[in-house]
Amino acid sequence: MKRLPDDELDYPGDDGLYYQDGVPFTGVAFDRAGHGLRAEEEYRDGLSWGTVRTWHPSGSPASEKQTVAGVFHGLCQEWDEQGRLTLYEVCELGVTVWRRRWAAGVLVEDWRLAESDNDFATLQMLRKHFLRGLTELGAG
């Protein structure tokens, strides 16, 4: 898989895609800090698609999140400098459906998307349109 520094990507912004030399980028873009990585992100056809990772200045993991078609989809986790989990979140098509947060190792939030939440209707609409798109592509 192609790997390159993220400053070699162009983001014109008019279509939401990242490009390398005028072509939507597929591969891994990374950002270095000092002697190590600060961040890396997988792309497919110009969209964030795969794993997004960041590191603290010490080199310890800061976050790992999954994306599909440019939005968070799947497990999202964050850690503090001591390696303690601070966020454990599940997203679906860009909508958070479940989240736990910790501060100094103590659980401070345990939340789940409820049918009464505004984002619930958004998620239902996204599911419908996403599945329709897969069917039209012959993947569903």
Language model feature labels by segment:
Residues 1-140:
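Glycine/tyrosine- and acidic-biased, solvent-exposed loop/turn segments at the edges of beta-strands
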